[in-house]
Amino acid sequence: MSTSTLINKAQTNSCGDVGVVDLLKRKVYDDTVKTMQGLDRRAKYRLNQCLGPEQCRTVRGGYPEFQIEFTGASNTSHAMAAGLRGLELEYLYTLVPYGAVSYDIGGNFPAHMMKGRSYVHCCNPALDARDLARNENYRISIENYLSRFEDKSGDYCQWQRKKPKVSKPLPRYQKACFDRYNEDPEHVTCSETFEKCRISPPAERDDIYATSLHSLYDIPYQNLGPALARKRIKVLHAAFHFSEDLLLGASEGLLTQIGGTFQRNGDVLTFSFLDESSLIYTHSFRNVFEYVTRTFFVACNRYAYMKEFRSRRVDTVFCSFIRIDTYCLYRSVFKDCDEHVFAAMDDAWEFKKKRVMLEASRPIFNDVAQFNVYFPNAKDKVCLPIFAVKSVSGAPVTTRHILVEKDFYWTALNHILTYPDGKADFRGVMSFLESIRSRVVINGTTTASQWEVDKSQLKDIALSLLLIAKLEKLKISVIEKRIKIERQGLVSLLKEFLHGLLDEYTQTMAEWVVEKGWVKSVDQVLQVTIPDLVLNFRDHFRCEFRTSANVSEVNVSEHLVATNEYYAKVSDLVDRNPTLAFDFEKFQDYCEKLGVDIDTVTELIDAISTGRAGITLDHTDDKEEQLPRTLAGSSSYLEEEPSDDLVCLSDKAIVNRSTILGELKNNVVIFEGTLPKNSVFVSAPDDPSVTIELSELHARPVSDFLSMQKPVNIVYTGEVQICQMQNYLDYLSASLVACISNLKKYLQDQWLNPGEKFQKIGVWDNLNNKWIVVPQKKKYAWGLAADVDGNQKTVILNYDEHGMPILEKSYVRLVVSTDTYLFTVVSMLGYLRHLDQKKPTATITLVDGVPGCGKTQEILSRFDANSDLILVQGREACEMIRRRANDNVPGSATKENVRTFDSFVMNRKPGKFKTLWVDEGLMVHPGLINFCINISCVSSVYIFGDRKQIPFINRVMNFSIPDNLAKLYYDEIVSRDTTKRCPLDVTHFLNSVYEKRVMSYSNVQRSLECKMISGKAKINDYRSILAEGKLLTFTQEDKEYLLKAGFKDVNTVHEAQGETYRDVNLIRVTATPLTIVSAGSPHVTVALSRHTNRFVYYTVVPDVVMTTVQKTQCVSNFLLDMYAVAYTQKXQLQISPFYTHDIPFVETNKVGQISDLQYFYDSWLPGNSFVQNNHDQWSIISSDINLHSEAVRLDMNKRHIPRTKGEFLRPLLNTAVEPPRIPGLLENLLALIKRNFNAPDLAGQLDYDFLSRKVCDGFFGKLLPPDVEASELLRLPVDHMYSVQNFDDWLNKQEPGVVGQLANWDHIGMPAADQYRHMIKRTPKAKLDLSIQSEYPALQTIVYHSKHVNAVFGPIFSCLTERLLSVVDPLRFKFFTRTTPADLEFFFRDMVVGDMEILELDISKYDKSQNKFHFEVEMRIWEMLGIDKYIEKVWENGHRKTHLRDYTAGIKTVIEYQRKSGDVTTFIGNTIIIAACLCSILPMEKVFKAGFCGDDSIIYLPRNLLYPDIQSVSNNMWNFEAKLFKKLHGYFCGRYXLRNGRYLRLLPDPLKIITKLGCKAIKDWDHLEEFRISMFDMACEYKNCFGFDVLESAVKESFPKAEGCNVAFCAIYKFLSNKYLFRTLFSDV
């Protein structure tokens, strides 16, 4: 029953249940998708010959294993056969194991070299002149290929001689082949026949194969077996042509599919093509006949080769000759020689004497080769004899055979047998046959004949059928009757019976029938034999058996060993230089070109980096850089050797206050004192007397805390350790100030709905005794409260029996956060402020140990419970040490001698200690360690840590800790170089990280694995596996995602430092590049060294961890030597200045086809064009799906959507453009979850008010021209902002529908600014990467206000935007709004001169990443421009907590502080934020040019400027998942900024244009024309082809595999400029 019948039947039974029908249709679609996915995984083959559509279908049907691309780039004779020859070769080598020694008999060795098959030897004997020409063509093809890699300039190619210059290296996979051919061409190709080939296979190899592509005819069949055995060939895979007509006695056999023909003249068999008379190949028919009919080919007295048929494809027969060991035959097949002779004697009457003797000498394999197996054209046909006689009477009758359909034969014969004896003549039979093969007319309708019979053979068939019918009648008449023939001979009897059949030929025919043995007399009995109608081919093969042998098994151990040793040398080089960017292929080619090994080059790089080679890479004399470099230098107290390249101050040097202030040019505070040698330290408080005690915390005004705010850059002087202690106090102050400032902002916000949740805070309504915002935890230690007068004070909290806070009645509201859960910061700051800041007198020893070296075990073994103290950072580590210590000595570890740092400072207890032991001390601020040393009064301190693991991390973003003060001071350092935890492969990695030799006691050799997952949702598929190990993540965002997904016991890598686990599963579900996941990052070192047995890395994107794991998997099982880490510095090319002129115009040629566009797209984004996404939405709707969502209210009545199929034009260009989707509950919810609910949380602790104002000042200070300084000049007059003229100007720009909606507005009250509507764009954004192949893209969400809200705020922000654009420096900065692409090109026109650095900051989830800090920054900028306070407050209330309603999908939810994609400040607000972000990071006052557009940006900077890590600051301060690109060609607003000599052009991205040409949302032809016009308006610059070469280089900079660029650029202009040609890109469905 068909699928459509099932669907219709199910629809009838379900009374029109659409769901059941959709499920059945879904089943059909799923099966289709699985089939298409399987087909897409096939090997790809490009066939260049020009073939017709029917030929293309034939080739595809004959080779379904390949995904064939027909380019039609070559128009040659016998194109079908020529194109198939390469395809047949690739098919043969799919049967040969990769890397196995192989002989290609008569093979095309250039084809093997291009494919990188260095394990193939080709035998190319010159048996005739055509072979000589073919071999010469092989060598010419190699020269043509090598010329592609040579310089094409005329300087190297001259008439007199050619001086080739290689401009690029060969591909890596071909290098081994060309090396082999260069060293010894005889090993690649020889001029001997295969039987006499002198190239022997390696003695140790037994995986030896051979192939024969149309070359088997020239090897005598009796020599094939011995020749294969001499080379120890295991299997010979062969392909050859043959026609079954030749076996039937025909002199000609046609191969219609390839246009070939066989001609036979005796034993001479010639092959040629119908359309090519010059190509004629001559063979021996007997030799070819033996290859076709034989089954076994004897090699020696033991081995033979059995022919096994594989398939027949497009007139080509494929078979395999498999070596068999006759000694392995079962013993029951043995017979004596006499038995062989006797068994064959019975067949002597049918076969010749020679055949009998040959049968007796062969093995007793009675195998049968069926005729219709080898030749499928003979299936269901019979072999009919055709008789012919000469015109001269008495001449003999000749016979040949043809194939006719069996049904036709029996139908005709049975009908002829019904004729009476007197009426069975040739004319009647001929008339009948003509009638049954002709077309007939039945009821006015022409009906084709059931059988196809050649008209030219019809008369011969009639004659044969008449003769066979006569014989059948004769047999029937004499059956079971004895006939006496004494008086009449057999011939005369037949002559009488056949009288009238052939008239004068009756005598001759009767004699011929008797001679053939069809009619004979045996014992006076007439026997009539009808010839067999189906031919059978048998080849009996017999020999003697004397010994036996066992079948050898396949050995795979060598493959495993080779895998371990692969790339060992290259891995060693990269491990020693993890910070260098190596292109392995280019680096290897460079080393081989110089003739040096990789070890020598590595030593040279190391010597240059360390200075041992006497070469200095870095020279700078810029005075502006000297002070920052000095401040960034390391102290002699912290380094084992002094740094010679720093600016040094003499010991006890006098500080010149004015000089330092002049250098810094910022808010810098200097304290008198002395500077230690080789050190300058930064930071000190303004007023050391301002302190906050814990006892004074209650009812303390907020102003007391805010007065503790410190300048950003503060200089400390004095002893190193004292400066560290002062810096730690300022760090605590900054943390407390940031906390209070944020609580103040939350306290001033308006909260309407009780019981909601917001970020990590809680808001208590003291008047109504309930939580307005429910906190995550209970019983916070303190908070910030506001009284009835609006005064804000800190309060210490108490709670009732129900866990509710108890406050005085004078307070109306309270706010708490995760930072107020404990008194940690307040208590520590209050106590440490009163301590004397003196240099510790204890001896400090740093025990620097590698991961797993037993640092904690050493502490416990040396710890004296009566006199020592152990301090650790976290509570979990503290409990672990107490447990382990008490397991050894019960009661030794107590809460008095094993404590955390916070507990030791806050809960001070009397007593002194002798020795202080600190575990993982390098994760603690050095100032806190110095304080604890003084408090504990110890005489010796042992700090255990690892300088290569994660150090102390500053969590307060508006406070800086100089690198000098972040390093620990110590008197002595002791190393621990042997790990007890890490397996051997991890130890190998550690040797690339540490400068010392690392060894391991572990007996686990290999433990590292990595797995790529297609998306973060796929991590749920590994839930059962992940339950068996510790779960770690790099970021808190990934940790929160796993916890929301239901995973338990998840920690970050930072939290797990110092811990040990048996199995570790490290998970990364964030695709954005992370600073902590990079080469040399301590987070990577910690992540890879936490386990003892097994480590598995699950990641959605390849990164340095995955690369490290893969490299480690390739090394051998022993530890490698250790080397130092080397650094290098890249040099920049200098560009000479030149003059600018108008851009020349060169009209673009209108060339190129649709196939050129498709080829360009496929080379850029391979695989995207094969994505079948027409039914993806219905797959999502009809499948089970698990979603992790925030709080949301759903109307389940909206879950069903009508499946209406829109009528759209079908694009002929296949791109990854999604078809339009129908909005619905699931679709809209999925978009909401993947976009609005998937906002990153990367930022650290920020003081929103302080930092927003600082960023605002920097924004205007850097973007405004020098003549605009006073803030009063920025402010817009209020009268103009709220004027009627301003509103009219805004209203005139709106659509008529908007005006109609506003006409019904009553203008009573302010519309609700926090109420938004939610919808989705029906057409997803086109993907310009490969994610479409494995990910269902979510639709873009639109969150928009009503038109009433826009009418209030639209004119205001429009006026403010105009003011902002008018004050920004127009010569250096461009906000791409209210401008044209021509204006943008004019702005960047002078960027062709100068040595500059081009920076692009690409941010994912830009709108959704914006939080309270971004909103504060934007509002500060609007304040500077003059926005009204009331309007600002209303706008803030509408964005802090947004209520979304999706009426189409039935969704209601609330989101916090995200950029709304549909309000009046969406575009300009995004543009302001990206500009402010870059102004806070980069020295924008020094830029040449900068452009901003939404989330897009481009900056032209001078080279060698100092600026912080942009990606890190974007993550930690701005909460952006950012990627920084430094390229030769800029990219801005979807256009490439191309610098071509003296000119600069902005050309649209060709990939975006070609992708849009595959649009699946075109309704009709009129819509298509509108679409073309809009596309041509965008890409009209393509009419000028000047600069296309630069555009190609810019494209290949991002996508190196892009091919066919110039033709594609011309094709874009060709189709877009002609509406008739553009219509050919689409078809009407």
UniProtKB/Swiss-Prot annotation:
GO terms for molecular function: ATP binding; ATP hydrolysis activity; mRNA methyltransferase activity; RNA binding; RNA helicase activity; RNA-directed RNA polymerase activity. Residues 1396-1509 form the RdRp catalytic domain. SUPFAM superfamilies: DNA/RNA polymerases, P-loop containing nucleoside triphosphate hydrolases. Residues 69-292 form the Alphavirus-like MT domain. It comes from the Viruses. InterPro entries: (+)RNA_virus_helicase_core_dom, Alphavirus-like_MT_dom, DNA/RNA_pol_sf, P-loop_NTPase, RNA-dep_RNA_pol_alsuvir, RNA-dir_pol_PSvirus. Gene3D superfamilies: 3.30.450.420, P-loop containing nucleotide triphosphate hydrolases. Residues 821-976 form the (+)RNA virus helicase ATP-binding domain. Pfam families: RdRP_2, Viral_helicase1, Vmethyltransf. Residues 977-1130 form the (+)RNA virus helicase C-terminal domain. Residues 48-473 are annotated as: Methyltransferase. It catalyses: RNA(n) + a ribonucleoside 5'-triphosphate = RNA(n+1) + diphosphate; ATP + H2O = ADP + phosphate + H(+). ATP binds at G849, V850, P851, G852, C853, G854, K855, T856. Its EC number is 2.1.1.-, 2.7.7.-, 2.7.7.48, 3.6.4.13. Keywords: ATP-binding, Helicase, Host-virus interaction, Hydrolase, Inhibition of host innate immune response by virus, Nucleotide-binding, Nucleotidyltransferase, RNA suppression of termination, RNA-directed RNA polymerase, Suppressor of RNA silencing, Transferase, Viral immunoevasion, Viral RNA replication. GO terms for biological process: DNA-templated transcription; mRNA modification; RNA processing; symbiont-mediated suppression of host innate immune response; viral RNA genome replication. Disulfide bonds: none annotated. Transmembrane segments: none annotated. Residues 845-1099 are annotated as: Helicase. Heterodimer of a large and a small subunit. Belongs to the ssRNA positive-strand viruses RNA-directed RNA polymerase family. This protein is translated as a fusion protein by episodic readthrough of a termination codon. When readthrough of the terminator codon TGA occurs between the codons for Lys-1130 and Gln-1132, this results in the addition of the RdRp region to the replicase. This is Replicase large subunit. It comes from Sunn-hemp mosaic virus (SHMV).
